[in-house]
Amino acid sequence: MRFPLRLTVDLALARLARTWRENAASTSVLLLAPMEPASPSGLDSSALHPMAPRAGTELLARVRNASAPVVWIGGSEPLLHPEMGQLTRCIAGTGRDVFLETDGALLRRRIHEFRPVSRLFLTIQWNGLERSHDVRAGRAGAFQAALEGMRVARLSGFLICVHARVHAETALGEMAESIHFARSLDVDGIVISSANGGSNSANAEATDLQQKIVEARKLIGSKWWESFSRLVGPLVSGQRNTTPGAEAVGVRAERESHANEESVRVA
């Protein structure tokens, strides 16, 4: 499971370009939620009309006005957006690395709208193994639908990334099985983050969750993807513009655990 050299260079350049005042994740990664309207603060929000798709021109303008080399497209199922195929082509065409997160259910139906380029990762969200995933998705067969979407995407030549989300009740053993299963599918990348935004507090439960994430990321088997998970984790788990708390505790723990190892910092 290799980390793209081009993405490594893009992130390194973003790190050099940012000022000391800016947060690494905010300057390296732009989060788009196409099925959610923009809030008054300028961040994507589902507070008003959760399923109102935003115009592709508006989303592309946000990308062009941002310096982030990585664009993570998530929020409410992005494949419900009618222009998603064209939008990803345009974003990748600007030289950005695109991670399109989906539950995978619509991939088979819409895969023909996308192009398998080296800057696009179709990112499948996992909430545990089959039983746990189906329960959290609220429907039987959700996990198998995700696997079928992955199969179709792989046969079509796309790069595949798994976004494994860790819940408070997730057992580390299940995470280990999930990662092992993902690697057996020959995925191109694995990202691990907390589910539902985690917690901004440093209480015992939140700290335990972050420590679980620390341990799970060690199982990825790639320092590059482990570092990338730390970079995008606070954004993709909904923790934007938050005060230091449990996530910071988890990041510090990971840094300390690798203090004596030679590792690559991508952000």
Give the residues covered by each predicted segment.
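Short glycine-enriched, charge-decorated loop/helix-capping segments at active-site entrances
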Residues: S46-P50, V135-A142
